[in-house]
Regions:
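Conserved S-adenosyl-L-methionine
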Residues: 2, 8, 12-67
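Short, solvent-exposed loop/turn segments at secondary-structure boundaries
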Residues: 167-171
Length: 202
């Protein structure tokens, strides 16, 4: 799916890409664009990208003294008063959990634990080289789209799926989806919407 998204963006001819529900940032990390706007309401995700951009070396240094263990995974669910520490814990949990949800420790007898830590370091380096040029926002989708809409803008939207409960930290109401559709019908730029198909969406 990622390759399809990137191809649609390339064919749009737009120079600015806005990831409205940014999540992991995978789309922006792989898109070739002059301007990249990342947005997510999840404070943990936004804080992670901002912290890596400002204090990459501090995060990498912590990985040098970190083990891959279930005990540490459980301990890292606790919130501290240190923002850098909380960002690190969030990243650690997501890299070592099922489906990146940060909730359940993913253990495999085939996994080389030291390789996992190395992979985490590589992910930080990859993120940093790209996100240092991002604009990072934490806005409601309506405010974000209105702020960045232009003829040169491409919006990618992968919102919480309709009528799927308990999977997302922030869910949308039926009215939210209705207003999203109305807003997208009026924008100057182009958009790609990735959403599940059900009777309401149709």
């Amino acid at each position: 799916m990622l390759n399809d998204i990137l191809e649609i963006f390339r064919n749009s001819g737009k120079k600015t890409i806005v990831d409205v529900f940014g999540g992991s940032g995978k789309v922006l990390l792989n898109a070739e664009a002059k301007v990249k706007i990342y947005n997510d309401l999840n404070a943990d995700v936004v804080d992670f990208f901002e912290e890596v951009r400002k204090n990459k070396e501090s995060v990498l240094e912590k990985l040098n003294y970190t083990l891959n263990s279930r005990e540490l995974f459980t301990r890292y669910k606790e919130i501290t008063d240190d923002k850098t520490e909380n960002v690190f814990r969030y990243f650690y949990r997501n890299m070592l959990s099922f489906n990146g949800d940060g909730k359940s420790y993913s253990y495999s007898s085939r996994r080389n634990k030291s390789t996992t830590i190395t992979r985490m370091k590589e992910a930080i380096d990859t993120c940093y080289n790209d996100i240092k040029s991002w604009t990072i926002e934490r806005l409601d989708f309506r405010d974000l789209i209105r702020r960045y809409d232009s003829e040169g803008t491409f919006f990618y939207l992968d919102p919480p799926y309709h009528n799927i409960k308990g999977l997302y930290e922030y869910e949308l109401t039926d009215q939210d989806y209705i207003e999203m559709k109305a807003l997208l019908d009026e924008i100057k730029g182009k958009y790609l919407l990735n959403i599940n198909e059900d009777e309401f969406v149709r």
